[in-house]
Every structure is written in C-alpha cells, then in structure tokens.
Amino acid sequence: MLIILKENIRTLGKLGEVVKVKPGYARNFLFPQRKAVKATKENLTKLEEQRLLLEEENIKRLNVAKELALSLHDKFVVLIKQASEDGKIFGSVTTREIAKILLQEGHVIDHRSLSFGGVSIKNLGEYQVNVELHSEVVVPITIYVVKSETDANELRQVKLQNQKSEQQEAEQDANKEATDGDDS
C-alpha cells in the first residue's frame, strides 16, 4: 500500500515522502496515529498545501521531545522482580512495566516508544533501554532489575549519591573556570 508520511519516521522516511508499507501496518498503526495518509492525488495536493503547517508542528514536537529528553537524561529505573537463586526472573520485563514506572515518576511515555534493542530482559542486572521520543530524539535510560525492595533502596541511594557527587564536581569545575577567567 502506498502512503504519504505526515511526519518523519526513522524506519520509513521523511515528512511528505510517498512510501510503500504493508496494509496492516498502515491501517493499524500509521493511520490511527495520524502519521500517514493513503497516497491519492487528492491527499498529495492537500499535503502540499499543509506542508508548512506540518513542518511547524513537527518542529514543535521535536522541541517538546528535546525538553523531555533533558528530564530523562541520567534517568534510571529500578524494577523488583521475583527471581530464582541463579538470577533468572520469572517471566520477563516488558515495555509496559517500564512505561508505568516512568508514569509514576511523572514522565508520560508510550510503551511503544521503548526499545530493548532486540534483547529480552529475563535476568537480574543492569540493562540499557532506548526511549524514542521523536524520530530524531532517542534517549537511553538504565534499567536495574533487582530481587528485593532492600536491594532496590540500596541501589537508589548509591545512584543518588553518585549523581549528587557528579553534580558537585561539575559545579566546582564551573566555579573554578569562572574564577580562572576573572584572573586574566
């Protein structure tokens, strides 16, 4: 099925391009999300008329995504899962679980924008998850899968202390550069 993209989609193409996709993908995802329309002469002329508006809208979404990316920078999520003695969890970690935790922390993120990079999380440990906020903005966040609440609390305390010390070092470096600049 030929469609016209109404926004940049990393895997398909740029705004306004005519691309061929499977009918189910278009019907079930692209059309309902208003990311594309069917490629007809009517829609092509409409799109040309609306191109500037769509580009402005895309720039606004990009700016919102960049702001959200700043709030997710250095973000980590701790998941508590039941596991066997050798560290295998019962079941696996899903994108919905991560999206739910992020929502509880005030970040509204669709679970479909989360990607494990083709890896299935079935063991305790540390994992990298990519959050695609926009076709041009992908933010990595760290997922820690632990066995108990005490492990989770210890990990959170250690991570928060590390972030505070890094922040203090950055402030000291900035102050040092400011005072060095004043001496010249």
UniProtKB/Swiss-Prot annotation:
One Gene Ontology molecular-function label: structural constituent of ribosome
Domain of life: Bacteria
PROSITE patterns associated with the record: RIBOSOMAL_L9 (PS00651)
InterPro entries per record: Ribosomal_bL9, Ribosomal_bL9/RNase_H1_N, Ribosomal_bL9_bac/chp, Ribosomal_bL9_C, Ribosomal_bL9_C_sf, Ribosomal_bL9_N, Ribosomal_bL9_N_sf
GO BP annotation list: translation
UniProt key word Cell membrane: no
Region listing for Disordered, in residue ranges: 160-184
Key words, A-Z: Ribonucleoprotein, Ribosomal protein, RNA-binding, rRNA-binding
Compositionally skewed regions (Basic and acidic residues) per UniProt: 173-184
An example Gene Ontology CC term for this record: ribosome
Function: Binds to the 23S rRNA.
Family of the protein in this entry: Belongs to the bacterial ribosomal protein bL9 family.
UniProt protein name: Large ribosomal subunit protein bL9
